[in-house]
């Protein structure tokens, strides 16, 4: 560590970036070294100059926020006597022990046969109330749903069988088939094998469509009549005082997110809760798993800013994990282990979530009024995006979504879904029963559970607690991906997670409803390859009919030929029925809006036109999603990594180059598929045009729909308008305002700032949580890290090196002092360039005015 004579220009530049008065700067301008400067700032003297910068952390912090930090008693001394920021409450550990999964039913059966006992089924909580009437009602409703789905599917399957050209399976003699030449066997059997495969896939897909239809239909009736005596939101009058012991933690797990937007939503939610007068019942936690050092530093500054501006010190907490275990579920486990015992309830927020104070206080009251509820999930409303694609998706979820969520509630009641965010959770049963162990084994479907929400809901229900959807509770919001490719990137992760969850289908003690939830989660993505192979087999059957001579006689001494049949009346009836099942829910949604008032959707004409345009757009995108989801499913089974490095885009639009890269293979597939069908039978192309045409148009559709300009123009024309745009609630208005302000003051090049900038370094040192004590190997490692950072400069450090420095307050303070004391140009120039590139004017000049006037 150098303690040489300091250059006056460098010292003046350093002091210029500390919020001091001119008199204070003048007092410090005579320091002979940076070690002396830090000693005078800290009012301490040190034998080793290496510790002086660490000691001045507290003084550098309170120069700009003295009153707020002192009033909230935010600065404390850690076990080593270093100044640290009290960014989290005191730890009071709670035992969180995940139960190992036993997913192999064969192993359980073998243990039973050999006389060895299996582990007992996890007991239900003794304090859960006796089974309520809604559970019997829910079971009866689901049996009715099963009958409706299967009945509809059987009738449709019978019609589909009658449409098939070959009706002679009963004449195929399997014994004779096995003794005849292979080519002859293939000629006879191939058409029937294709038909049978098509029929099976059709049955599965039609049953899936039928489930959605009946769910939407019952949701329509629920919303139209407004009569639902099992509605969870009716359990509370909405004005009961919240008991003092009903403390609630709002936790927001984040990982390398858009920092300005995250903390804008957090501040809007915080201020909305404060406006209710019940802020003393809530605490807010930002739980960061970020590993990008620039983002980490930006998060720290954003947390300090929101605490200062919203007066959130002691109510808004921030923690960044150093050991990123089990992703989001592990982040929540760590929170529960450290602070879960301090709270009765927990509300989980996504990085883009916004919730109103009225919604949050209502959730707490509902939990208090429903003592057997373990989770109450809200129905988040999508808003806040401006691209054409996102606005159409927002419109679809806002118009059609309420039917499906109300329908889910009708069929499931208190054995429903949990979507992982914008929901309130009862802490004690969650800690006792919902910790997630890794899935056993090796391969793509083992390890940490990706889609934790469905599993946590299933475990909560297994323990005897209810899981409800408060589908009619307003004030819960989220954002959707801005374009198709970003949505597909998210879908790949969800696809892998849902396929992993299906391993839990036969785990002991799971409620049948949640086994069905695991199945529907798989079908959400498995339906894509089923549909794709259904189309491929249909094309193959067309090729067989065109290229192969029909086999009219399938067995010896057959008197009458088997003629291929065609029943256009049945085909039209089946096609019409399928169209009704697919599109009637959308029409019912519009009818419901007409009945309740369409003004906030742009009026009856505009909302109807928007629905028609959205239907056309969804038809264009359905085959594109089919191909991608098919690829995702195959990738998961083949063990390919679920990653997709998509470039960052400031305007959320998709460049043509990326669209060609992602959609190019689909375009070629659609083109050659169309040529094949034209060669086989041109008349069949009309049936396949919606598929191959969509694939060939995927590139321009993906690019054009990602444009912000088209989205804003459609809003000006009142197309795809939603109530949150027509009359924005205060929480969303505040989020937009704070996002704009945060972007204007966003911190760029965070790691360089944390090393060089006097205040950013002080903040980073105060929030670093290195537990290393005094030991020779540790000291040697610190010296090596600082020496390496000085040698290679900011551009030469990899992300691991940066994280190690950012997590060690001693090494970070030493690096800061040495960069300034020795005038290392690589670090100082990078910092100066970063400050100069800020979109807003710097708070302080890079150099004092007197120095700026001097010639170089």
From Swiss-Prot:
It is a multi-pass membrane protein. Keywords: Cell inner membrane, Cell membrane, Glycosyltransferase, Membrane, Transferase, Transmembrane, Transmembrane helix. The chain crosses the membrane at residues 144-164, 198-218, 517-537, 574-594, 608-628, 691-711. One of its GO terms (biological process) is glucan biosynthetic process. Its EC number is 2.4.1.-. It comes from the Bacteria. GO terms for molecular function: hexosyltransferase activity. It is an enzyme of class 2 (transferase). GO terms for cellular component: plasma membrane. It is found in: Cell inner membrane. The keyword Transcription regulation does not apply. CDD domains: Glucan_BSP_MdoH (cd04191). The keyword Membrane applies. HAMAP family: MdoH_OpgH. Belongs to the glycosyltransferase 2 family. OpgH subfamily. This is Glucans biosynthesis glucosyltransferase H. It comes from Pseudomonas fluorescens (strain Pf0-1).
